[in-house]
Amino acid sequence: MASSTITLRPTPFQLARATAAAIPQQLSKSPLLGILGVIMGAGVVTLTGRMITLGLADLKGHLGISFDDGAWISTAYNAALVFIGPFTVYLGGLLGPRRILFIAATSFALICLFIPLIHSYSLLIMAVVLAGLTSGTFYPLTLTFALRNIPLPYLPFTIALYATFVDGAVNIAPSLYGWYREHLSWQWMFWNSSLITPLMMLCIYYGIPKSTAAKKPRATPSFAGFLYASAGFALVYAALDQGERLDWWRSGVFTALIASGSFLILSALVRRFRGPNPLVDMPYLRQWNTILLGIGLFFFRFCLVTTIILVPQSLAIHGFEADQIGPAVIWSATPLLLVAFAAALLLLAKMDSRLLMAAGFACMAFASCLNANLTSAWSASNYYRTELLMGVGQAFAFIGLVATIVLQGVFSGGLSKPQWILTFSAFFHTIRLFGGNVGAVIMGHFVAQREKLHSNLLGLHVQSGNWITDTSIHQLSAGLFAKSSGLSAAMSRAVGVINGRLRLQAYTLSINDGFYLVAWACVAALLLVALMRKSPLNYADLSAIQQQATARQEAKA
């Protein structure tokens, strides 16, 4: 009689117990330094990317390059971040997170130190790409350390601080860059990172333990699939980032980038199905909550464009500089530490992390609706209260999102093996990058199209021969005649003034439409939260499980 074998899948409680037993219970000095390294690594990458975007005009002036050439600088950095995200899984599994982080951090600090001294455009692009490749390892590898070495009672605080520093770096960058340019020099947009990174390196050296040699997998990991996927994602991102400037499908460069990137991604998928790779064996990706969390992370990154694009651009159209825009955006960062501490306490008090997400997205939607009352007379001070509410919403939403992602990793088996933790981190890291960058592309295209629409609609009411239009031109011409070379010059200047007013009003209306789009994206995210299944346990239960597992080990000893 033939015997049959039934393989029982581990329950969520068994997976949680195995994960808790593998994590140290006591918080020594080394994990404290490790937490600091995780936080600094998360913040410095985001801060550098924002600094490059804000200082693009200074970089172009430093090199003497055109607008089209300068547009590729930030694209090169972000494309490198997208490239290294999936490839970090292979590097981390091959050499270990600690070694990769130390090499990458050293290289990144040196590159940022010398970038302001470069006067060649091609060398600058190469240096920016190298900076993106080295700093792009910080996100997945530092989070990998946090998930494997931070005691579970302290994990909510680590998650809260991690989310706070990532979110805070976005909001504080305009004020910091404005202060650097006003009191020091624009070069500090890079030297800032070269000073912070060595501190992160010390935390990595003393805070991240040397990993033991991993068992050799039965199947040898292949780097080709990672290379195809990484290069494909990077090319697709570069195409989307430059699409508006290149006029989308009318450009051969855009078409070539999309076609080549799509082909490489398809090649990676074919290779994955034909020859499974031990480093990307991810059954948890097929789970309902994992899919919804990935989509939710995409929506959250899209909603961040309110502070990254909409608010700064609505002020920049009036001629505001970075140091004048900063006070409006920095209000989003003001409540972050307080909210992070409160959110961590709520998680330890058995609060469902989905409720934090829902509260955050609701606050962001309400703040976006308030910002949609924007008029052409608004200044930075008009954003203070709404951006404060936006900051509270962003903090709660991101902390709740990251906390739910970590719980999903615990109960789906994603954190049961070191290789799977790397894959888990890199998967959400890639979505985080694409969500933010693609979100910015979508919003930029949306605002541009809405501005054209509003310009055409407003132009229907401002036509030659209309008595209101003619009266306005004559009145402005009379006022400008004294400082013009003649009547025709005064009338041309008057037409230019009216055209500028129309453009300002059209742009203001398009920004309002952008705020409404963000509000609807928050509503869609709330629907995703409602569809998510509740985790079997919360963070308070995980702490108790870890204590029980430790007690059993001590009893056996």
Model regions: which residues?
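Extracellular/periplasmic helix-loop-helix junction of adjacent transmembrane segments
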Residues: 55-83, 123
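Interfacial helix-cap and linker-helix signal at transmembrane-aqueous boundaries
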Residues: 59-60, 91-92, 124, 176-184, ...
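Central cavity-lining transmembrane alpha-helices of secondary-active solute carriers
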Residues: 75-90, 139-143, 330-343
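Helix-loop-helix hairpins in multi-pass membrane proteins, especially solute transporters
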Residues: 85-226
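Hydrophobic transmembrane-helix bundles of small-molecule transporters
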Residues: 178-295
